[in-house]
Amino acid sequence: MYKPKIICLLLGMLSGLVFAPTFFIPALLTLSYLCYIVQKSENWQEAAKFGYLFGFGHFLSGIYWISIGVSVYIADFWWAIPFALFGLPIVLAFFISASCTLSFFAKNNKYYQFIFCICWVLFEWVRSWIFTGLPWNLIGYAFSFSDILIQTLSIIGIYGLSFIVIYISTSAYPLFRKQFTQLKILLASSVLILSVIVIYGAVRLSNNPTNFTDIKVRLVQPSIPQTEKWNEEEFWHNLMLHINLSENSEPTDLIIWSEAALIVPDDIPQVKSELLQMLNSTNAILITGGISDNKKQGDEFELYSAMYALDKNDHKLFEYHKSHLVPFGEYMPLKKILPFKKLTHGLIDYKEGDGGLVYLEKYNLKIKPLICYESIFPDFVRTNNEIVDVIINITNDAWYGKSSGPYQHFHISRSRAVENGLPMIRVANNGISAIVDPFGRTIEKLNLNEINYTQGLIPKKLNSPTIFSQFGNFTILLLIVFILLINYLLALILDN
C-alpha cells in the first residue's frame, strides 16, 4: 500500500499548481485518482490516510510562500520557518482527509462521485470559518485565470464554483474502475456543464461593457521591501516616495495608498505638513492604510490596522478598523499559553475592529473597506450592492517576494467583485494593484515589484444585486439539484 500513498502525496503536490500564477489546469485530473483510491480503500482509516497525504502535498505546493513571509525577519523568527512551510499544510491536510473519510462511507452508493464532491466543498466551507478560518486556494479559484469562467460567481459564489470544478475534475475517476458507462455519463455531463458556464460567461461579458462613474482614482504602489518598511531610518524616504508618486499634473479625485502606508500617526506636525501640501497641490482626498492607536486608560493603547480618509483641510472623513486579523501575524492566539510574540513589527497585538461600511460624502460614495486578507472571506465580504458602490481593498504583499502568494491573493480578491456586482479598487504596497470592474475585468493594473502609479475612473456597480449577494450559499443547493437532473437525464439517454 505504500505505492498508492506515495502517488497520493505526489499528485497532491501537482494539484497545488492549478492556482495562480501557474494555472496548470491538467493537474485537476489528479482529483480523479483521489476519488478512485478513496472508494477503493478497505476501511475509513485508509481513506483518511490517502486524503491526508494528498492534502499535505496540495497545500505544501500551494501555499509554500507563507514561509517566505516568516523569513523576512529571519534573525528573530528562523525557528518559525519550518512551522510555516510544513506546519500549515500538516493542519490544513486534515480538511481534505475529513472529506475523503466522509466520502468513504458512501463508496457503494450509486452517486458516490457526487457525494465526494459535496464532501470536498463542505470541508472547504468549514475551513473558511473554523479557528478564525483560512479559505485560501479553494479549488474554484483554479478557474480564475479566465474572466469568462468566473462569471457564475455572481450566481453560485466561490463554493458553487468549487463544486463545479471538483465535479469536472473527478469525472474521469470511473476510468480507473473500467466503468465505461458511468464514465460516459460523467464526461458528457461535465462537457455540458462547462459549455453552459462558458456560454453564460461569454454572453454576460459581451452584453455588459464596463460603465464608469465620474470619480477618478489614483493608485500608488511604492513596492517598498518589507525589510525597509518599518525601518525608522527609511521612514522619510518611504513617505516622500508615496508623495512623489501621488503628485501629478493630471487631476484626480482620490489618491489611495496601501495597507499601513503610514506607520506613524498622521498628526505628527512634519508628517501632517507634507500630507496637506500634497493634498492641496492635487486637490484630492487621500485614502490610506495606517495604524490607529486609541488610548484606553492611562498609558495603555489599543492598536488597530486602519483605513482612513484625509482631505486638504485636515479633516478625517472616515476611519475603518480591520476586523479580520491574521493570527500569529497581527496577534498571537492563545497568548497565555504560547510564549511567542507576533511575527509582524511591534510588541503590542492589534485589536479587532468593528468592520462595517464607510461613506465619502463629497462623492456620495458608499465604500466596503477591506484590509489585506479580509478579501479572502466570501461571506464576510458579501454585500448587497444597493447599499455599497465600491470595494476598496488595501494590502501589503511585500512579505512574500516574487512568489505565488501575491498572484493568488489578487485573483482571490477580484472574485469578490464578481460575487457582489461591485467594482474593486485594490492597492498594494507591493503585489498587484488594480481597478477591477463588477465583472472581474481588470481595467488598470500595476504588476508585482512595479514602482509606479496608475489611475482611472471608478467603474459603476451593477444596476441590481447579484443572486449570490442576495441569497449567499443557498444557491449551491439549486446547483446540486441541477447537476443531479443532468446526470439522471444523461443516464436515461446513454443507458439505452
From Swiss-Prot:
<keyword id="KW-0997">Cell inner membrane</keyword>
<feature type="active site" description="Nucleophile">
    <location>
        <position position="372"/>
    </location>
</feature>
<feature type="transmembrane region" description="Helical">
    <location>
        <begin position="114"/>
        <end position="134"/>
    </location>
</feature>
<keyword id="KW-1003">Cell membrane</keyword>
<feature type="transmembrane region" description="Helical">
    <location>
        <begin position="148"/>
        <end position="168"/>
    </location>
</feature>
<dbReference type="Pfam" id="PF00795">
    <property type="entry name" value="CN_hydrolase"/>
</dbReference>
<keyword id="KW-0808">Transferase</keyword>
<dbReference type="GO" id="GO:0016410">
    <property type="term" value="F:N-acyltransferase activity"/>
</dbReference>
<dbReference type="InterPro" id="IPR004563">
    <property type="entry name" value="Apolipo_AcylTrfase"/>
</dbReference>
<dbReference type="GO" id="GO:0042158">
    <property type="term" value="P:lipoprotein biosynthetic process"/>
</dbReference>
<comment type="pathway">
    <text>Protein modification; lipoprotein biosynthesis (N-acyl transfer).</text>
</comment>
<feature type="transmembrane region" description="Helical">
    <location>
        <begin position="6"/>
        <end position="26"/>
    </location>
</feature>
<dbReference type="InterPro" id="IPR045378">
    <property type="entry name" value="LNT_N"/>
</dbReference>
<protein>
    <recommendedName>
        <fullName>Apolipoprotein N-acyltransferase</fullName>
        <ecNumber>2.3.1.269</ecNumber>
    </recommendedName>
</protein>
<keyword id="KW-1133">Transmembrane helix</keyword>
<comment type="function">
    <text>Catalyzes the phospholipid dependent N-acylation of the N-terminal cysteine of apolipoprotein, the last step in lipoprotein maturation.</text>
</comment>
<feature type="transmembrane region" description="Helical">
    <location>
        <begin position="50"/>
        <end position="70"/>
    </location>
</feature>
<dbReference type="GO" id="GO:0005886">
    <property type="term" value="C:plasma membrane"/>
</dbReference>
<feature type="transmembrane region" description="Helical">
    <location>
        <begin position="183"/>
        <end position="203"/>
    </location>
</feature>
<feature type="domain" description="CN hydrolase">
    <location>
        <begin position="220"/>
        <end position="464"/>
    </location>
</feature>
<feature type="active site" description="Proton acceptor">
    <location>
        <position position="259"/>
    </location>
</feature>
<dbReference type="InterPro" id="IPR036526">
    <property type="entry name" value="C-N_Hydrolase_sf"/>
</dbReference>
<feature type="transmembrane region" description="Helical">
    <location>
        <begin position="77"/>
        <end position="97"/>
    </location>
</feature>
<feature type="transmembrane region" description="Helical">
    <location>
        <begin position="474"/>
        <end position="494"/>
    </location>
</feature>
<comment type="similarity">
    <text>Belongs to the CN hydrolase family. Apolipoprotein N-acyltransferase subfamily.</text>
</comment>
<dbReference type="InterPro" id="IPR003010">
    <property type="entry name" value="C-N_Hydrolase"/>
</dbReference>
<keyword id="KW-0012">Acyltransferase</keyword>
<feature type="active site">
    <location>
        <position position="322"/>
    </location>
</feature>
<keyword id="KW-0472">Membrane</keyword>
<keyword id="KW-0812">Transmembrane</keyword>
<dbReference type="Pfam" id="PF20154">
    <property type="entry name" value="LNT_N"/>
</dbReference>
